[in-house]
Every structure is written in structure tokens, then in C-alpha cells.
Amino acid sequence: MKAPVVRPSLTRFAAAFAGGAVLLATACSPDPAGWNPGDGDETVGLMTPVLLNAGTTAIYSGDYFLEPEEVDSVVWPDGLRAEYKADSAVYRVTGALKKPLDVAHFWMAGASFDLVLYANGAQYRTFTYPRQPGDTAWAEDAVRIIGTFNAWNRSATALKRGDSTWTVDVPLFPGNHEYKFVVNGVELLDPSNSRAVPNGIGGVNNTLEVKREGLPARPLKTRSVDESGSQITLAPLPKNQKLVVLWENHALPADAVVQTENSIRIQLPDEAADLPRSFVRIYSANAHRRSNDLLIPLEKGRVLLQGDLLQRHDWEAATLYFLMVDRFANGDPSNDRPLNRPDVLPQADFQGGDLDGVTWAIQRGFFEKLGFNTVWLSPIARNPQGAWGLWDKTVPNTKFSAYHGYWPASNTQPDARFGRPDQVRNTLASAHSRNLNVLLDYVGNHVHEEHPVYRAKPQWFNSLYLPDSSLNTEKWDEYRLTTWFDTFLPDVNTENPEAVAALTDSALVWVRDYGFDGYRHDATKHVANLYWRTLTQKLKHQVAAPRGQRLYQIGETYGSPELIASYLGSGLMDAQFDFNLYDAALGFCANLNTDATRLKEVLDASLAAYGHHHLMGNISGNQDKPRFISLANGDVRLDEDTKAAGYTRKIGTPGASAYQKLAMMHAFNFSIPGIPVVYYGDEYGMPGANDPDNRRLMKFKNYTPEEDKLRKEVAKLAQFRTKSPVLAYGSTTVKALSKNVVLIERSYFGERVLTILNRSNQPVKFTVKQLQLHPKTR
């Protein structure tokens, strides 16, 4: 389908403005008869869609193009205008789309690169709180609102005092939002709203539903592939529903997409045969709403239908195992250096795990037998000696060693207690020889006070003190980008270009020089996007482009979907952990005050926020949470201090039903879009309260019957997931069949996978007809 180059008919504006800004044309469209996908080296990866802001949206050309200065023109959809800042290669886009989605066309050397844009669908809602006697003496910002829409940040949204009420207008995306008022520092419910839901810690939050406008768009559905593997058939769409079909980053020409009343036929381009892996992406919307999206992988130009064609860098098919190096396996006793101090409890000290222990597990097939193709290692950079911090809420008190690795005293050198540089390389070589990816947990937000860079460049760090002389520690939301995690952990000023340039060079060492396949980034929301954008550009230029390697970066952010999504995109992160979905899944599977309807709502909200084929991490637990199985068994409660629980009582072996609940959690995570993540020990049901009790030593044998059964069930799930195009790339439908039963359907070119989760003690029966199953379904 190679066609001659036809340039679009454009009216160009070349008038220069102050600061190097250029106003670009907005109204013309490229000639659909011309289609030129370029040379293939202009971009790295897929150009992820952009959700436009209500005001101005900054679109960084360098997020998408290796040489952004080579872009010679852009055609923006009707309703948008853009001002270009040449010194930063940023388009400042204003206006509003006329439709829920449209496409911007970037032209470079005769080729069009097409970026999908989403209209901002936020709707303003007015919140009011009644005036109180004597409130004229209150501060002007005495009444505030916190909720899922502002990441529960007490300093984000203040109400204005009026004649009879305090009032504020808040933009909210469609869906259910939880909130409370904060009046003079005290959290209070909305007296005018009786709708409330449990907050997971013993109380309730108000809830408000923002309804979507208009009727739903008809969902996109794959039907079939022809014998050549190069023509796709989809279910038909209404005539008024917009359809956008991209191969890689190029909208296919009109003659390649044929719509009739009965079907949609898509002819794949000849150029696809030249690439071992490429992708077709399909988007659609009616006048008011977007539909789901489709992501279809191609193997040398043919639709990928066989699971054995999936490779380890097909991240949609990744299964991720997270281990804490010090607590996993001791492969080299010669590097054991516990503090053995009376002021450090054993659970807060080094216990001997190291990289040789990880290599031992790799070489004996531990991860492969469990079905995992990706391993995430806790940080291994050099950390300080000695003991730091203090736990004094229970007796005995304890200080902490740096066994966990999150206090970097070097950003580039491995900690000798975990291994030498050659042992790092040996671990990676062993993993890659067995087709395993390895991600490194990396800390960019802060350093330890013994780090040489803090001593040499103190101006690169934020102040420990606020303007009122109070400590700026653990202010996670009020001072998100400047707060210190502790007084001995200086916070990097990631808005300082000089600091960012140097410290991203250090981060690059682990992927470029050692060969890690990507990162898990610690404390993502506390780091400015300048850092993430700079690091990602370096990765593209120095690793991904020259090696043709698809890397993966996943971040850690606790907050609203909007905050989490603000760190995602072609120039930023590939994914983050979906903690909001974890909370809902925990509540449902462990039977902790979340029903099936709520779980469906949160899952649907995640798909809307991150896309239907996102790479978000769906976790069974992590190093900062109580073990799922102990919560499910009632041994630890969410409304208590879950860290103190681990110091004051023994959290023992759970009952049989808790293993079943954990199995359900795993089944949920392995069935939905995103990457299933198993925290070490969760495959067999390791118990524990919160940190450090959730970081017990791993065991590799002597499983109880319940542990062994769970471990085998997880292995079946993971092995199926890694070889299932349906679970990696299929469409998703979620139904709450009752308050206790959830159905998840994934479908991909005629193949369906159904997962039915029933948390009740009563069996639920379905007929083949009810589930629309083929009689020969297995």
C-alpha cells in the first residue's frame, strides 16, 4: 500500500513572536490520498493520546520525536490553536475540540505523524458548606474540601465565604467522587449530602456522582482476520461515530478503512511486514463519549494470534514478580554485614539476601516455573552504614539499617552487601538468557545525607525548613515536590535543571551500562516532570533508539487518577501502580466493605483514565502495606496502626478461607488489563502486618498444603497470562452480577476468556446461554 508522497495543502504562518513563539495554522487537513509513514527512525514507541486541559495544554514535541526541530508543520483539529516555543519545542494548545476525540497531524520530511487528542470532559460542580455562628473570625481559607479529585490534599481547594454559605466550584470528570470538608483542620461530612461510602479505615466519605453526557458510544469489537493475516474485520459502528485507525504513529488512509452497515474492514500496510513487531491502534467516539480503544499487535505485518509469538518486551503480556533483595535468598554469605546492634531489632537489620541469591533462583527456574517473565528488584545502589531513623510508638523501640535500599548514598555504585558490579551483570545475564526482564527499583526523589552530591552541591536540594521555620517532613500533599521523607534524607530539587541533568545521567547508568530492562521509580509524585521528561529522553536517545529495545518505566503515586495520569505519556512514565484499584479489589476479595458494583466502578474508572490497554501495575501487595492474607483473615485491621501491629503481636498463619480470598485477588489481577504484580511470598500466602513485618524472609520449601495449593494456582494463572493474546490485548467488559459476584470478559478475534469471581459462601450457577458460550467452550 505504498503511495506517492502528497503534501497537505496548508496555510503557514511564519511570523515570529517574543520568546521564539510561532502561531501555527489550525484548520486545514492532509490529503487522505497521500500516505507516507516515514523512515521509522523519527519516533520511539507509540505516541500516546493527550487529554487536553480545560485551559492551556503543553505538548512537548520532544516527547514524541527524537529530533523535534525537524517537524516542519502541524495541522491541529478544528477548534484548537497552538503557539510554538522553539527554545523548548513546546506547543501551547488552547481552544476546545468539537468532538470527544480528534487527531493532530505532525509533518516531517513528507511524512505525517498523527497524535490522538481527547477533549476535556470535566464538568463543574458547586460545593457549599453552611455558615457557622462566629465564623467571621475564621481565616479566609478555614473551610476546605478534600477528595479523590485533589488527592486528598488539604491545601489544594479552599471555599470562599459568602452571605450564607462557603462555596467553591470544582471541575470533576464523570464518575463517582469521594470527598469531605475540612473545617479549621477537622474533617467533617457534607451536611447536605447523605450519600456516603466506607473509607477503609473505619469511617466514611461522602460520595458524588457526575453523570456522563449523552449516550454511550458503541464499543469497538474485533471479529476476524483473513487468511493472509493482513486484513482485520471489526463489528460495525453507527454512521455518526468517528473512527481513527493508526498503524504505529500514522493514520491509515481512507481507502484502507472500509465501513459498511455490517462490518469495518482494515487493510494493513505493506510496510508492517518490515517490522518484527508493530501495532494497530483504533479509537472511536460519538458526539458525546469515547468508546473503548483497541491495541492489535502485528508479527511482521500479520496479526499476532499465537501466544508463543509473544516476547519478553511485549510488556502487555508481562507478569511481574517483586522481591526485596535482602529478604529473598542468601547466595553469597561472604558479603553478610548485619549491624547486630542492640538498638536495631532483627527485623530492621540486614538478613543476608543478595544478588547471588537472585541469580540462584533464576538458574533453578524459580520464576519460570511460577510463570513470571519479569523480576523487579528492590534498590541495590550503595546505602549508608549504621542505623538511622527511630520507631518509638511501641516497646521496644528500634532504629533501622538500610537493608531495604531506599536511602541512596550513591546513585551509580551497587551496595557491597548486595553484590559487586560483576555480580549485578551476572544476575542480568542469567535472567536474559532465560528470557526474563529485570526492572530496577530506583530512587530519584532523595538521597541520604552521606551522599557525596549532597555535600558537594547542597544548592541542588530543597530546604528542610518551611518559611515559618517548621520542618518540611512527610508533608506528602501540601508540599509534594519539596517535602523530605526524614531529616536525614535530603530532597532533590527536581525543578533545578542543573541537578536534573546530572542526576538523570546517574540513573541512566543502570539501563545503559548494566542492561536493566527498565525501572520501578520510587516516590514518583514527589518528583517534578522535568526529571522524568529528561530521563526518558535520554533513555530514548541512548538506549531505546540505538538498540531497538522497548523499555518499561513504572512509577509509584498515591492519589487521584488525574494525578497518577499526569505522570504518564510518551515522554514520561509508561505506567504507575493502580493503588485505587488495589484498594477496591482488596475490599471486595477480602470482603472488607466493598461490593461488586463498587469494584466495577473503580475498574471502569481506571480504564477511562489510563486507556483500555494500559500497562498499569495491578498489585497483590507491596513493601508498604500489610500482607493481603493477614487483612483477609482479620489478623490485621485497616482501622489500626498496621505497623504497630507487627511490633506488638505475632501475625500468624491464616485460616483456609484467607487463602481462597488471596487466590481470588490474584485471579482478578491476572484477568484485567495491565501488568499483574505479585509481591514475594504472596504466591503462597506469606502473612504479616505492615513494614517491617511484611518483609519477612522468603521460603522456598516446606509449604503447608494451603500454601502449596495457592502457589500452584498462581503458577497456572501466570503461565496462562504470559501466553495469552486475549488477556494481553483483548477488549474488556466488566459486570457486577450481584453484590458478591463480578464477571470479567476479555475478547480478541473470536476468542473469549471469562473470569467469574464469587466471594460469597454460596455457589452461583450459570447456563451456557446466560454466558453466551459456545457449546464446546473449555
Each language-model region and where it sits:
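Bacterial signal peptide processing site
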Residues: 29-31
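Solvent-exposed, low-complexity, repeat-rich "mucin-like" stalks and linkers
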Residues: 36-75, 221-239
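Substrate-binding/active-site clefts of carbohydrate-active enzymes
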Residues: 318, 328-514, 534-546, 562-564
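C-terminal motif of bacterial Sec signal peptides marking the signal peptidase cleavage site
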Residues: 24-27
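Loop/helix patches that line or flank the sugar-binding groove of alpha-linked glycan CAZymes
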Residues: 315, 331-350, 600-601, 607-774
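Active-site-proximal helices and loops of the catalytic beta/alpha 8
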Residues: 37-39, 44-47, 436, 446, ...
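Aromatic-rich carbohydrate-binding modules that target alpha-glucans
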Residues: 116-176, 184-211, 244-264
